[in-house]
Amino acid sequence: MSGRGKGKAQGTKSKSRSSRAGLQFPVGRIHRLLRKGNYAERVGAGAPVYMAAVLEYLSAEILELAGNAARDNKKSRIIPRHLQLAVRNDEELNKLLAGVTIAQGGVLPNIQAVLLPKKTEKKQH
């Protein structure tokens, strides 16, 4: 460094990378975890921002569907059962989380068509 320039102005406040990117998820923490996790020798500046955005989007999507499931069950609090219903009823999320077990999630209500009672036609006289 040659020492040129005035550096940072005295009155300016530091701005987090999350707020710069317009995200709620912590970009700095994700960057640290990527560096410490030995995933690669070096981590680019854009990688943690992109990853934080993806994680935030997926979280928002699941919470939106789980909130709808809670409302359908006339509950105001999301429980693991609502998360399970949200994920398993959504085709893409179910594919993404196919190998994931949600604790206390239960199972989807499903009765095989063969086991359902036969529909008999009423005879008209």
From Swiss-Prot:
Residue numbers of N5-methylglutamine PTMs: Q104
Location of N-acetylserine modifications: S2
InterPro entries, per the entry: Histone-fold, Histone_H2A, Histone_H2A/H2B/H3, Histone_H2A_C, Histone_H2A_CS
Residues making up the signal peptide according to the UniProt record: none
Keywords annotated in UniProt: Acetylation, Chromosome, DNA-binding, Methylation, Nucleosome core, Nucleus
Location within or outside the cell: Nucleus; Chromosome
Entry-linked CDD domains: HFD_H2A (cd00074)
GO molecular function: DNA binding; protein heterodimerization activity; structural constituent of chromatin
Region of interest: Disordered: 1-23
Pfam family, one: Histone_H2A_C
Main location: nucleus
PROSITE patterns: HISTONE_H2A
Gene Ontology cellular-component annotations: nucleosome; nucleus
Metal-binding is among the record's keywords: no
Function: Core component of nucleosome. Nucleosomes wrap and compact DNA into chromatin, limiting DNA accessibility to the cellular machineries which require DNA as a template. Histones thereby play a central role in transcription regulation, DNA repair, DNA replication and chromosomal stability. DNA accessibility is regulated via a complex set of post-translational modifications of histones, also called histone code, and nucleosome remodeling.
Stated family: Belongs to the histone H2A family.
Quaternary structure and interacting proteins, as annotated: The nucleosome is a histone octamer containing two molecules each of H2A, H2B, H3 and H4 assembled in one H3-H4 heterotetramer and two H2A-H2B heterodimers. The octamer wraps approximately 147 bp of DNA.
Protein name: Histone H2A
